[in-house]
């Protein structure tokens, strides 16, 4: 007797044989390091209008030794290294140059495990690592508080200057894209010893989690031509670990003005990835490409952001839009297929944030030059 085997059974057997993408452990080596950061390297020119900064704009970028620090500040950031010796920084690929102040992208598929070896290379600042969204146990939370843990479970709380600690984070299904999400989503990681101080000092970065099988061997997503990660944040330098050092270096006469409202306002940097007034580089794509944007926010009550792209539209969970809503600590993933070549404005639509420089350009090159 000849049995007829349905074609769907062959397909099922083939899929079972191939199986899902194998879960792996991905290891990253990050160092927290002091850096001299420039919020507006184009100064004295504002790239948004290609003219000199106006008097109102100079409040946020011009230093004068007496009343304002300016556009350069000592900060801390996460820097990726090639191995546990922490001797050779890993070069940031051109496609991620737009990350600016942010730490490196940590990638994982659902089912993977992330091991992040953190070395504190600052001289005085205690640091840690805390992820959003992922599964971690008490020895890898990265937050010091009265949680009933003890012994080895407290080693993650604080990494002192010169110290090294390995954080282990799992990526279960509940940390990955949901039913209505695209093939990848984004989470934040940041230092959490003193979250307000640590994040305003600059210790923050992105985690991108994709569905199994969506990440190619070269580290790029299937079906996506370009990815951009942008953090909208008013970095409050008044609350930075390095405030005193910045005053001493760039505005020594302002040492007695730390409670002055005008001085404090000049230290609030309305930034996109740590850049003001269209200094954010690298947001370039081609007409018709599949472009994924990961949008992040951190901060306080002033960090209510509405990212807006001129010239093109995006899709979020089946909805067409050109403006998003971001609250502090939120993460959004949206897709764009640009059909309108040109150099376009990309900014927060909150008026006060526009005035203070929370804006950038993105460029869509024509499909056929």
Label each PLM-derived region with a short phrase.
Residues 1-3:
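N-terminal secretory signal peptides that target proteins for export/translocation
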Residues 22-369:
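Copper-binding active sites and cupredoxin-like electron-transfer domains
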Residues 6-16:
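Bacterial N-terminal signal peptides
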């Amino acid at each position: 007797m000849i049995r007829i085997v349905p074609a769907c059974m062959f397909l099922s057997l083939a899929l079972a044989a191939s199986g899902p993408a194998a879960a792996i452990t991905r290891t990253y080596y990050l160092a927290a390091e002091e850096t001299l950061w420039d919020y507006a390297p184009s100064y004295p020119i504002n790239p948004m209008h290609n003219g000199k900064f106006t008097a109102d704009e100079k409040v946020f970028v011009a230093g004068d030794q007496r009343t304002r620090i300016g556009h350069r500040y000592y900060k801390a950031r996460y820097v990726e290294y090639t191995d546990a010796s922490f001797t050779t920084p890993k070069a940031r690929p051109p496609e991620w140059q737009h990350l600016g102040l942010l730490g490196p992208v940590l990638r994982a598929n659902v089912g993977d495990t992330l091991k992040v070896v953190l070395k504190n290379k600052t001289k005085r600042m205690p640091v840690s690592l805390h992820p959003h969204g992922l599964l971690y146990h008490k020895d890898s939370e990265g937050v010091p508080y009265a949680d009933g843990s003890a012994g080895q479970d407290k080693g993650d709380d604080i990494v002192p200057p010169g110290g090294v600690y390995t954080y282990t984070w799992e990526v279960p299904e509940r940390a990955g894209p949901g039913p209505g999400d695209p093939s990848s989503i984004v989470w934040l990681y940041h230092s959490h010893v003193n979250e307000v101080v640590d994040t305003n000092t600059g210790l923050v970065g992105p985690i991108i989690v994709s569905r199994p099988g969506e990440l190619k061997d070269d580290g790029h997503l299937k079906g996506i031509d370009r990815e951009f990660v942008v953090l909208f944040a008013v970095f409050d330098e008044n609350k930075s670990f390095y405030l005193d050092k910045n005053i001493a270096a760039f505005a020594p006469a302002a040492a007695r003005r730390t409670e002055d409202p005008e001085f404090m306002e000049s230290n609030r940097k309305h930034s996109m990835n740590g850049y003001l007034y269209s200094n954010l580089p690298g947001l370039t794509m081609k007409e018709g490409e599949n472009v994924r944007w990961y949008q992040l926010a951190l901060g306080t009550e002033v960090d209510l952001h509405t990212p807006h792209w001129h010239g093109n539209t995006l899709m979020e969970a089946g909805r067409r839009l050109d403006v998003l809503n971001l609250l502090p600590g939120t993460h959004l993933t949206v897709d764009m297929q640009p059909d309108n070549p040109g150099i376009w404005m990309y900014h927060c639509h909150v008026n006060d944030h526009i005035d203070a420089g929370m804006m950038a350009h993105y460029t869509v090159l024509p499909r056929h030059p």
